[in-house]
Regions:
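Catalytic-core regions of core metabolic enzymes
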Residues: 1-428, 432
Length: 433
């Protein structure tokens, strides 16, 4: 599915544009102007001659040139007729910010909206949504002002949200935690385009490395299963699913009209399709940020290298608790460790079972030997490296040593528990293929 016309438009009409501070149509105009959108902006307002210094039109039909996308922010009862005019104009995509449809019990109005859209072959985002953002080209037709909601820098994470307010909080959080994003979609009621449509588009989007979502429910279960299964073959998909309890499901129904369904069914669907489920906002972006830096593991076998026995034990518990396996090191790898001990490269009283405990006086060069042996083992899919910097023996060379492990093409997770000292050494690596 190609939705480039929604994210890379050459022109946009803002229907309901306003000069009045505090109005949604005013905020949308300012965001399009201030965040660097290079296309043409056509404000539509029946009363004003100009909006923020730009010539205004009384109807989208009066605009003399082509319009790729229209953003509608007017009372809901007027939206179907306005959409009819968009169809006559040849508009390809419409973002309906307006509320008062299915989520408010007005099912017939939403059905009328969809009827008009199908008549003219228009694709709709919403209604009852915050808007969409393409951070790559500055196309931001959301309505939250930057002094209230920061915008993240361009990066590899796409995020779609069934809650506009939660989506805004995510964007703000991502900006303040330096998490780069490619695109943001507020799904709203999903009268037309739904989570599966956008997932299908994003799986082929070159700017997106990881697809993330906040979902209360899916529109079409069979469609979601098929699309998610195909999407996860190309790039990671991480979903924060709400409505997990009976109370949450009821709240979802009143929020967007979503049928949250049985949470156990969703869990099974995620497992079958390879979707990674997050349980909190922080977890969602921790997963996503990690997955933009390195490719997913090819298997579930984890090796641990540590300079602290207790930390290795706790990590072993964690590996099994999340459904992964502790790797069984091959005989060849064990022989490498034994030989290195004889040669004095590794201490005699270390353990080269998994976890690989290189003991508390380990410098970075000892870590490098152990990490290489583990990553060269075909039985190891993921390496977890625990570095307790409280030991004076551990030098800052460990940071560069861990970075060199990327040559093996396997995910490496670096854990440095404790205080501020590791933060002074750590610099975030650039995303790599």
């Amino acid at each position: 599915m190609n939705l480039d016309f929604l994210f890379y438009p050459q022109s946009v009409a803002v229907i309901g544009a306003s000069n009045k501070e505090g109005k949604i149509g005013n905020a949308i105009m300012k965001n399009l102007i201030n965040f660097g959108f290079k296309g043409k902006i056509y404000p539509v307002n029946v009363k004003e001659e100009k909006i923020l210094g730009i010539k205004a039109y009384k109807s989208v039909l009066e605009i003399p040139e082509n319009v790729d996308v229209a953003v509608i922010s007017i009372p809901g009862k007027f939206v179907p007729q306005t959409l009819e005019e968009c169809g006559q104009k040849g508009v390809k995509g419409v973002v309906v910010i307006s509320a008062g449809f299915k989520e408010a019990g007005n099912v017939e109005l939403e059905e009328k909206l969809l009827e008009v859209a199908r008549k003219w072959n228009i694709r709709i985002v919403g209604p009852n949504c915050l808007g969409v953002t393409n951070i790559e080209n500055g196309f931001d037709c959301t309505f939250n002002p930057p002094e209230r909601q920061a915008r993240p820098e361009f990066g590899g994470i796409a995020f779609m949200s069934q809650s506009g307010a939660f989506g805004a909080a995510i964007l703000d959080w991502a900006a303040r935690h330096e998490v780069g994003m490619s695109k943001f979609i507020s799904l709203g009621n999903m009268a037309d385009l739904d989570e599966s449509d956008f997932m299908e588009y994003l799986k082929d989007d070159k700017a997106t490395r990881v697809i993330t979502a906040y979902l209360e429910g899916v529109k079409d279960g069979r469609k979601f299963l098929e699309v998610a299964r195909n999407a996860t073959k190309k790039k990671p998909v991480v979903i924060l699913k709400s409505g997990r309890t009976e109370a949450g499901a009821k709240a979802a129904a009143s929020h967007t009209g979503s049928l949250a369904g049985s949470y156990t069914i969703y869990q099974a669907a995620f497992e079958q399709t390879g979707v990674l489920e997050a349980r909190s906002m922080r977890q969602l972006f921790n997963y996503a940020k990690a997955l933009t830096m390195q490719k997913p593991a090819k298997g579930d076998r984890v090796a641990i290298v540590t300079n602290g026995g207790g930390a290795g034990v706790m990590m072993s518990d964690g590996v099994l608790e999340v459904g992964l396996k502790m790797a069984d090191l091959s005989e060849e790898t064990k022989e490498k460790f034994a030989k290195a001990i004889v040669e004095g490269k590794l201490p005699a009283h270390m353990s080269y079972k998994n976890p690989i405990d290189i003991i508390g006086d380990a410098p970075s060069r000892r870590y490098e030997v152990a990490m290489r042996y583990a990553l060269e083992d075909e039985n190891v899919d993921v390496l977890a490296v625990i570095a307790l910097f409280q030991s004076p023996a551990l030098d800052e060379g460990i940071v560069e040593a861990v970075g060199r492990m990327q040559e093996y093409g396997k995910p490496v997770v670096f854990i440095a528990p404790g205080g501020a000292y590791p933060c002074l050494l750590y610099t975030s690596p650039s995303p790599r293929d």
